[in-house]
């Protein structure tokens, strides 16, 4: 069975293709399960408008579109409605309301510390050791809520780091120990792997990270992190990820629901 629970839509402002294009591509790529997990529609306290996620007013359209595709393609592929989101203490209740309104699952992808409207993208500041540890702390807090299904790109912090330093090890230990204790998978991110294989490296998946964290024996799930339907047809990237993880001795899982 081939599952992917990390699929975006154009509502996030940095993806291409229609929602149905992703479903058709998933069928072409041999997927049995496709989960849409676009960036969460945070309702910020300030007038700030995000450049990288749907607006709160787009949630209903997103939900209705995914559910309509779920019915249209029933019997061909199982489709699920989810969101990728950070853990923000002050906005946590918004996720509970989205869950009550039909969101089937959340994946924990920490892109901003504390709140997007007041802080830069973590990939650009995690070269600073204190920021990296705060990133790890916030990720651990999210894990311990029990709300999220898995941790997306846990090694995102290597984006602007050239060496896997002792602080990087400490952050990895914090995240992977918490995920292990919670029985929560961590994601091997295929968008990052695609970048590496096409000479546009993003810094993750990071080989040193994945070798180092083997000691925690985490469950690992593949996430296409699709922002283009073509990514779901790319079997070379998928197969490469499986081979790498198998070589390192990681245990793959493919379901969260």
Model-derived segments and their meaning:
Residues 2-4, 33, 78-82, 104-107, ...:
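Structural preference for beta-strand elements that scaffold enzyme active sites
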Residues 47-48, 94, 119-120:
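Short aromatic-enriched loop/helix-cap "lid" or pocket-rim segments at secondary-structure transitions
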Residues 91-95, 205-206:
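Alpha-helical scaffolding within the catalytic cores
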Residues 101, 107-216:
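Domain-core and long-helix interface of multi-subunit machines
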Residues 221-229:
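Acidic, metal-binding active-site segment of PIN/NYN-like and related structure-specific nucleases
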Residues 233-257:
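Mid-to-C-terminal alpha-helical segments outside catalytic/metal-binding sites
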């Amino acid at each position: 069975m081939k599952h992917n629970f990390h699929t975006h839509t154009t509502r996030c402002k940095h993806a291409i293709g229609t929602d149905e294009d992703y479903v058709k591509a998933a069928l072409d790529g041999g997927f049995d399960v496709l989960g849409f997990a676009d960036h969460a529609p945070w309702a910020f306290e300030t007038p700030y408008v995000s450049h990288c996620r749907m607006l709160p007013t787009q949630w209903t359209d997103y939900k209705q579109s995914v559910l309509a595709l779920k019915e249209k393609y029933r019997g061909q592929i199982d489709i699920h409605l989810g969101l990728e989101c950070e853990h923000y203490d002050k906005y946590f209740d918004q996720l509970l309301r989205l869950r009550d309104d039909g969101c089937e699952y959340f994946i924990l992808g920490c892109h901003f510390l504390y709140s997007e409207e007041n802080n830069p993208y973590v990939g650009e500041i995690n070269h600073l050791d204190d920021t990296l540890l705060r990133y790890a702390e916030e990720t651990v807090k999210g894990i311990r809520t029990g709300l999220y299904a898995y941790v997306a790109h846990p090694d995102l912090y290597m984006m602007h780091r050239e060496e896997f330093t002792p602080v990087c090890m400490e952050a990895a230990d914090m995240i992977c120990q918490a995920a292990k204790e919670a029985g929560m998978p961590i994601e091997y991110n295929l968008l990052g792997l695609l970048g590496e294989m096409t000479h546009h490296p993003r810094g993750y998946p990071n080989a040193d990270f994945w070798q180092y964290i083997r000691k925690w024996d985490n469950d690992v799930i593949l996430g296409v992190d699709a922002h283009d339907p073509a990514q779901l047809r790319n079997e070379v990237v998928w197969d490469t990820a499986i081979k790498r993880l198998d070589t390192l001795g990681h245990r793959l899982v493919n379901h969260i629901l």
